[in-house]
């Protein structure tokens, strides 16, 4: 929950940039599920943040 969590999302966004757009949604879903498994629970806030990071990725 602390400010130290932010780099995780940025690193996640960095990795998502390397994924071609067709694979991006499944990969994002997988990332959400993985985070859910690791932390036990992912709140709506974290999910929103993940999607916000992902939606800021330019499609190239």
Curated annotation (Swiss-Prot):
SUPFAM superfamilies: Bifunctional inhibitor/lipid-transfer protein/seed storage 2S albumin. The modification Pyrrolidone carboxylic acid is found at residue 1. Residues 1-21 are annotated as: Disordered. The keyword NAD does not apply. It comes from the Eukaryota. Residues 12-21 have a biased composition (Polar residues). Disulfide bonds: none annotated. Is used as flocculent to purify water. The flocculation activity may be explained by the patch charge mechanism, due to the high charge density and the low MW of MO2. This is Flocculent-active proteins MO2.1 and MO2.2.
